[in-house]
Amino acid sequence: MPLPPDITFDSLALIKMHSQNMKRILEVTLAKFTVNLSIVTVYRYLTARAYLKKNIEAEFEILKDIYNIVPLLDDIAIKAAQIEANLIKKEITLDMEDIITATTAIYTNSLLVTDDPKRYEPIRRFGLDTMPLDKFIKEVELMVEKELI
């Protein structure tokens, strides 16, 4: 399956993509795709890094250089509220982070790469497309293999 040009990482996928053993995959991903991050995803990532006593000011500058950080725009806030209200009517509750991350992916017309696609299942009917992180990594590895042949 060809991957779309635009992707969005949720916070756990972002953390995993920035682990040492994913360095090459991350480099290829950044070279081949426009990677969007919700500002809420950035916040969660920086919280994890601050917990590990990292220099989050410097890390934030790096994130701004390599990713398209999407602020909580009016359109995203309104769409997220509509989605959440619809889910609440169906007695489905999701974390605000997940709703905003998913809405950001919908807004940017990008594939949401996540370690846990089931979390986002109720939002798929609003136009969200998801892919498990492990499948995305395999697809990127295949892209690299094909280029080497």
From Swiss-Prot:
Keywords: Hydrolase, Magnesium, Metal-binding, Nuclease, Toxin-antitoxin system
Amino acids binding Mg(2+): 10, 98
The EC number(s) this enzyme carries: 3.1.-.-
Gene Ontology MF terms: magnesium ion binding; RNA nuclease activity
PINc domain ranges (all copies): 8-125
Residues spanning the signal sequence: none
Cofactor(s) the protein requires to work: Mg(2+)
Protein task: Toxic component of a type II toxin-antitoxin (TA) system. An RNase.
UniProt family annotation: Belongs to the PINc/VapC protein family.
Subunit and interaction comment: Homodimer.
Name assigned to this protein: Ribonuclease VapC4
UniProt organism field: Pyrococcus horikoshii (strain ATCC 700860 / DSM 12428 / JCM 9974 / NBRC 100139 / OT-3)
